[in-house]
């Protein structure tokens, strides 16, 4: 995907490492001396890889019989191109194949800094994130029990929480698309607000101690 030892390769490794860190508000910020497009690119690749692994673990539980509708909630159904009804296994396979082709296209996702990003790069990124979000929604709504059965709830929550805050920060997904998981999103927002208050409190205490010393 990214050429070894290039800045983009190293940035991707950094992004992959941050997905297990809980300080999301800081981690989603663009690192110094890197462009927004670089940051969007490496995180898009990493979120795709992570979600692909989750779905791979669930594939045997998402079948034509057990999962006949590509749902993101009780009244939310996702269609493939031109409002074509598609069963979840086919829909998700179509999405993953399409995204993989985009990620492998060096004109869209340049492997190193010698090639510039296309002018429509953020729009392409938005389309990818929207499609990935719909798969997250389907997994949470229709396969959460399966996730519990394989002991991967905390891993899914960690990945999705990072994905949610990242997509919200850079406005990659339209507000209405968040509807299926809005209660989970609110829960995560409250958690992060609490963490941030605790962090600020700790900083104040540390500053106060330093002054006294």
Label for each model-derived stretch:
Residues 122-173:
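Chromatin/DNA-recognition segments of nuclear transcriptional regulators
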Residues 52-123, 128-140:
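Amphipathic alpha-helical interface segments within eukaryotic helical scaffold
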Residues 63-66, 107-115, 140-155, 171-183, ...:
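Structured alpha-helical bundle/scaffold domains in large eukaryotic membrane-trafficking regulators
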Residues 4, 33, 37-40, 44, ...:
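Amphipathic alpha-helical protein-protein interaction segments
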């Amino acid at each position: 995907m990214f050429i070894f030892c290039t800045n983009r390769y190293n940035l991707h490794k950094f992004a992959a490492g941050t997905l297990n860190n809980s300080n999301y508000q800081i981690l989603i910020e663009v690192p110094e001396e890197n462009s927004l497009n670089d940051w969007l690119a490496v995180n898009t690749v990493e979120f795709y890889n992570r979600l692909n692994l989750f779905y791979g673990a669930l594939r045997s539980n998402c079948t034509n019989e057990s999962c006949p509708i590509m749902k993101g909630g009780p009244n939310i159904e996702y269609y493939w191109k031109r409002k074509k009804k598609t069963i979840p296994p086919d829909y998700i396979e179509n999405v993953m194949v399409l995204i993989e082709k985009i990620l492998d296209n060096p004109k869209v996702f340049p492997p190193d800094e010698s090639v510039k990003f296309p002018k429509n790069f953020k729009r392409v990124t938005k389309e990818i994130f929207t499609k990935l979000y719909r798969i997250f929604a389907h997994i949470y709504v229709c396969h959460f029990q399966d996730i519990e059965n394989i002991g991967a709830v905390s891993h899914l929550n960690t990945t999705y929480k990072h994905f949610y805050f990242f997509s919200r920060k850079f406005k990659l997904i339209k507000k209405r698309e968040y509807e299926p998981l809005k209660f989970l999103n609110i829960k995560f927002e409250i958690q992060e607000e609490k963490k941030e208050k605790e962090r600020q409190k700790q900083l104040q205490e540390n500053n106060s101690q330093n002054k006294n010393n």
